Amino acid sequence: MQVLSLNKINKQIKDKIILKDISFTLEEGEILGLLGPNGAGKTSMMKIISGLSRANSGKLDILGIDADKERAKIKSQLGFVMQDNNMEREFSVKEALLYYARLYKVKNYKYKVEKIISQFEMNTWQDRKIEKLSGGMARKAMIARALLVKPKILLLDEPSVGLDPDVRYDIWQEIKKLKNMGISVIITTHYMEEAEYLCDKIAILKQGELLAIDEVEKIKQIMQKDENEDITLEKAFLRFIGKEAY
């Protein structure tokens, strides 16, 4: 089932083109990775989908609803975990989750907070202040917070940036579980290993344009110079954006 559709989305600030004629769809339970150099438009696209920003033109449908006209209807169906920790720093993890659950009027919120704390294995540090959390703990807590409202779509901006490899792998496992729950995910990332491990499809952006969107192996095949070349996703990506390493 299709949960998201972008049709000719354009974003411009004064004379600067941020996004140009972006069109793609997202299916239920699908994980899509947005790849592109800095300034490619990845975060701008996430903000438009989340409702934090608006396109100048184009159509955005979320769960079959026109997001520009009826955003309130889909607000609880969409979660957005930003790169920076924006949780209430003076609260403990549990307090922050309870606060958010009450704010969004989650039914049986105390039970659901306990359940998600257990699900994300946060029991031993649920009473720790947000400001005292490590990067990996904070990222887990933010993803858990977003899932309290049971969104159909989750947006993750650089979900494992700055984390140690072992912690990064733990975050990946949590993201993989979302797919099994039928949640559709869009991530932005600079890690090719992360994109290849997590994503069903990859979208490559450069200067606001969508250069390609397809399965990882097909993306590699498109940029393969001959059938005997052992091409990595990183090499394919660099060829797409015109910066192949020698």
Pin down the residues of each PLM region:
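Conserved ABC ATPase "signature" region
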Residues: L98, R102-W125
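Catalytic Walker B motif of ABC-type/P-loop ATPase nucleotide-binding domains
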Residues: L154-D157
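Conserved ABC ATPase signature
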Residues: K129-G136
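ABC ATPase "signature
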Residues: I213-D214
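Conserved ABC transporter NBD signature motif
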Residues: G58-D66, K73-I74
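Conserved catalytic motifs of ABC-family nucleotide-binding domains
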Residues: K150
